[in-house]
Amino acid sequence: MSQATDTDVREDGIIESVSGPVVTARDLDARMNDVVYVGSEGLMGEVIEIEGNITTIQVYEETSGVSPGEPVEGTGSPLSVDLGPGMLDAIYDGVQRPLDVLEEKMGSAFLDRGVDAPGIDLEKTWEFTPEVEEGDEVEAGDIVGTVPETPSIDHKVMVPPDSEGGEVVAIESGNFNVEETVVELDNGEEIQMHQEWPVRQQRPTVEKETPTEPLISGQRVLDGLFPIAKGGTAAIPGPFGSGKTVTQHQLAKWADADIVVYVGCGERGNEMTEVIEDFPELEDPTTGNALMDRTCLIANTSNMPVAARESCVYTGITIAEYFRDMGYDVALMADSTSRWAEAMREISSRLEEMPGEEGYPAYLSARLSEFYERAGYFENINGTEGSVSVIGAVSPPGGDFSEPVTQNTLRIVKTFWALDADLAERRHFPSINWNESYSLYRDQLDPWFEDNVRADWPETRQWAIDTLDEEAELQEIVQLVGKDALPEDQQLTLEIARYLREAWLQQNAFHDVDTFCEPEKTYRIMDAAKTYNDAAFEALDAGVPVEEITDIDAAPRLNRIGVQEDYNEYIDDLEDDIESQLRELY
């Protein structure tokens, strides 16, 4: 977040009352959503309500010690972010202040109030390579040059979306900082490498298109059963300790997006520390470079001011849209949207608004929709295509999925990954309940899997779903009468389903090989279980007792496929052994 520019001189106001993060001021000449600086320390805040000459402000910093009578300075500008080279590999707070720069300024890891810094380094020079020539006509959004921001990502310098465009009269390659002019147009407009954009305003596009390509996560249960599309939306609700954050970390590490924006919204500080420590050491499987080269982190932990939780999700989605405009596929992880909703509830109650269900404000659904609807696969105004995929964790108290945040989120998103405390207690991770989860993208993504993985992907997956569904029904009977009371074919189905659960749905996030599973391997593990199923039922039909079928030496080797680096050879040998050992029984 940059210091707001004084483009519109405004009169200062006087603080009238202070209630936590909510401050009221009188005689302040301001507009809705303007940034203001509150008190003698200049704490950043945002106008959220105006009634007569009384202005209500939510303050993005701790307000202890602020008293009535202190001044409030208006800026005339809405809450905006700096967009330009230098955002990748950066760690921001909820209003885009770079934490490493603030630490240098303060000389301490503990930040004083009222300290500000530009969102991107204004002094650092970048190597600019033109993409257009003098005499070319450019319009709003057009790419005029590139900057090698990291080894993985070329930053594309664009004409601002609100520009009138024109003919290029001056452009040259060289090293420039972000405030220097790199392109001059015939109408006198000068284009720099950075631009500002209000966080609450969606960046313009030509058209929102139907997504047809999956966002490959490397997690078998997600890619195999509940895929999300590039440009899709997903929710991960679950009780405490069920694995929401580790699942989000896995997605941030291995999703095949070009850019990842990770927003830690009101979660534990040590979880953000884990991201900051792990990501620089991890290798991006697509490029071979460090994962941080494609990652932007926004850390707004639980001990930071409540009001900034709202700004951090908008800051994250605006940065994601900026990279989308370059033609990149962006994945945004928000962990957790429940903390943002709780911040809305606190501020709403301080404003004495009429509460809705469980005390949340009546506009909870509208705010969530506003956020998730900025996701999508778009044709950009410069002719490129890009996507923003949004994956939001939800933390319902006690794992109650009927609470308002979960229910309102489910009305908006198209993929639902339900985390289950019972699975987590049984050490089944990722603890995504395959009976409760769903993906509405499954059918529209099937053609991609048929073309790029295997033609029989949908049929094999449907067999796995049917087997797991049948197991869920049989388990209710087993709990009443025991497994031995079932017919032999149903006992065999339970055994096959167990291998599906243990070999295919379970995955070790901390194993070097098993942490990431490509779609081909996901298919082969599923198909190996189906091979065992088909051969086992043939043996059963030939009169072989179920105990002998399940007792073959080859079957337990299914559970070790996930950790095999050279899995194709391993599975080929395993399938041959399964079929030959079962044939020997009859």
From Swiss-Prot:
Q: Which GO terms describe its molecular function?
A: ATP binding; proton-transporting ATP synthase activity, rotational mechanism; proton-transporting ATPase activity, rotational mechanism
Please name the Pfam families in this protein's record.
ATP-synt_ab, ATP-synt_ab_N, ATP-synt_ab_Xtn, ATP-synt_VA_C
Tell me what reaction this enzyme catalyses.
Answer: ATP + H2O + 4 H(+)(in) = ADP + phosphate + 5 H(+)(out)
Q: Which InterPro entries match?
A: ATP-synt_VA_C (IPR055190), ATP-synth_a_Xtn (IPR031686), ATP_synth_asu-like_sf (IPR023366), ATP_synth_asu_arc (IPR005726), ATPase_a/bsu_AS (IPR020003), ATPase_F1/V1/A1_a/bsu_N (IPR004100), ATPase_F1/V1/A1_a/bsu_N_sf (IPR036121), ATPase_F1/V1/A1_a/bsu_nucl-bd (IPR000194)
Query: Which keywords has UniProt assigned to this entry?
Result: ATP synthesis, ATP-binding, Cell membrane, Hydrogen ion transport, Ion transport, Membrane, Nucleotide-binding, Translocase, Transport
Output one GO BP term: proton motive force-driven plasma membrane ATP synthesis
List locations, semicolon-separated. Cell membrane
The keyword Lyase appears for this protein? no
Q: What is the first-listed, main subcellular location in coarse terms?
A: membrane
The family database entries (CDD domains) matched by this protein are listed as: ATP-synt_V_A-type_alpha_C, V_A-ATPase_A
Similarity field: Belongs to the ATPase alpha/beta chains family.
What interactions and quaternary structure are annotated? Has multiple subunits with at least A(3), B(3), C, D, E, F, H, I and proteolipid K(x).
Name of this protein: A-type ATP synthase subunit A
Organism in which the protein naturally occurs: Haloarcula marismortui (strain ATCC 43049 / DSM 3752 / JCM 8966 / VKM B-1809) (Halobacterium marismortui)
Which gene name belongs to this protein? Answer: atpA
